[in-house]
Structures are given as C-alpha cells and as structure tokens.
Amino acid sequence: MNLTLLATEGFGLNFNLFETNILNWAVVVFGLYKFLPSFLGKMLQKRREGILLELKDAEDRLVNATKALDKAKKDLSSAEEKASQIKADSFKRSESIRMESEKKAIEEMARIKQSAISDESSEASRAISQLRKEAVELAIKKALDSLPNRLDSTTQENLVTQSINNIEVN
C-alpha cells in the first residue's frame, strides 16, 4: 500500500482480497481449525495421561509413606515401652543388688564383730587361765615353803594315811 495515497485520500478500507492476504489467513485458520485439534488434542491427552500417572504415583507413594510412618510410630511406641520396661527392671535389679550388698556388709560386720569378741574372749580366757596357773603355782610354792615348818610327825602320818585311803578308794 502506498503511503502517499493514504495521506491524500484519507482513511478507508481495502477490499482487495489479494492485496490484504485474507485468503492466506483463511487457509491458515481453516488448517488450524481442521488439523490442530487432533494434533494438539493428542499432545494434550498424552500430557494429561502423564500428569494423571504422576499424580497416581504420588498418591501411592503418599499411602506407602503414611503406612511406613504409622509402622514407625508403632515401632517407636513399642521401643519406648520396652525401654521403660528395661529401665524399670534395671532399677529393680540395682535396688536388689544394693540391698543384697548392704545385707552382706551388715553380715560381714557382724561376723567381724563376733570374731573380735571371740578373739577377745579367748584372749581373756587365756589370760585368766595363765593367771590361775600362776596363782596355783604361787600357792603351791608358798604351801611347800611353809609345809616343812607346819608338818610335825603326827600330821605327816595322818596325811600319808589319808592319801593311801584315797588311792585305795579310787
């Protein structure tokens, strides 16, 4: 189109079909209308099927993940119960061991005390026995020392007779 022509004649419509490319546009629009829906429809259908498949896969993974989460929660609660049971058992066991240790310590202390008392009493009885022995020896020595001065012949004769009678009786 000529610009000088437009400037001189003013605004107008051009109805010449060959100049305006209306036929070309009509062919293109008709082709798009006729062939584009089947071609574009197939592409959109494939894309839609792909999206639906991905959504179904995502939903399946969500279901599996939910099941796995539920199982993990159940396992966790079971493990927590088992841990608390083990903790309670270990507390009971440690308390039992502590009580047993205290009992053994008390028994050992009593045994040591009894041993000390028996050692002390055996020491005391040995000392008493030793003192008695020394007292008897001292008394015998004193008696023997004083005996010659006290014994006269009649007393000595009576003593010998009495000793003989004692021997005969036994």
UniProtKB/Swiss-Prot annotation:
Transmembrane annotation, as ranges: 15-37
Superkingdom of this protein's organism: Bacteria
Taxonomic lineage: Bacteria, Bacillati, Cyanobacteriota, Cyanophyceae, Synechococcales
GO molecular function annotation: proton-transporting ATP synthase activity, rotational mechanism
Organism: Prochlorococcus marinus (strain MIT 9312)
Localization, UniProt: Cellular thylakoid membrane
Bilayer topology annotation: Single-pass membrane protein
Keyword Zinc attributed: no
Name this protein carries in UniProt: ATP synthase subunit b
Keyword annotations: ATP synthesis, CF(0), Hydrogen ion transport, Ion transport, Membrane, Thylakoid, Transmembrane, Transmembrane helix, Transport
Pfam families recorded: ATP-synt_B
UniProt record similarity statement: Belongs to the ATPase B chain family.
Entry GO terms, CC: plasma membrane-derived thylakoid membrane; proton-transporting ATP synthase complex
Subunit-level organization: F-type ATPases have 2 components, F(1) - the catalytic core - and F(0) - the membrane proton channel. F(1) has five subunits: alpha(3), beta(3), gamma(1), delta(1), epsilon(1). F(0) has four main subunits: a(1), b(1), b'(1) and c(10-14). The alpha and beta chains form an alternating ring which encloses part of the gamma chain. F(1) is attached to F(0) by a central stalk formed by the gamma and epsilon chains, while a peripheral stalk is formed by the delta, b and b' chains.
Disulphide-bonded residues: none
SUPFAM superfamilies, sorted: F1F0 ATP synthase subunit B, membrane domain
Xref: InterPro entries: ATP_synth_B-like_membr_sf, ATP_synth_b/b'su_bac/chlpt
